[in-house]
């Protein structure tokens, strides 16, 4: 399944995503095109806290201005080259995937959808890295739906 097909699928099955409203609020109060990088970083940190509370997960540490965007599973840290919304959402999704590996949190990435959808993020993938298709599509899905709201 291609990424754009996965995004469209997510729009159908993850309509009740907890991430959409906080992202809408963030987009309304922050200038993501020409805004100050430090203001963007502070906005991402607020979003990080809000999403962590909504999903009831630990708050990942955000470090910016590094060489590569990355999520470190062992420490739960998010590294970003720039404070960008899509990059942050992508890495935050990896954080959710990491926490979902615990049995008691199974289904965390299914956004409250039925149990039938628990495996959707990991089926019919293009990328070999576990969860990469899901993280790319989820970040695009959240932004597209937030822009349309």
Predicted stretch roles:
Residues 86-99:
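Active-site recognition of the HExxH zinc-binding catalytic motif
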Residues 32, 39-46, 51, 57-59, ...:
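Metalloprotease/metallohydrolase-associated module, dominated by Zn2+-dependent proteases
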Residues 6-12, 74, 98-101, 133, ...:
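Intrinsic disorder/low-complexity segments enriched in polar/small residues
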Residues 2-5, 79, 129:
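Exposed, low-complexity/repetitive linear segments and helix-based recognition motifs
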Residues 67, 72-73, 80, 95, ...:
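Membrane-embedded and juxtamembrane structural elements of multi-pass membrane proteins
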Residues 1-74:
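A metal-dependent hydrolase signature that marks the N-terminal structural subdomain at the beginning
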Residues 74-88:
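Short pre-active-site segment immediately N-terminal to the catalytic Zn-binding motif
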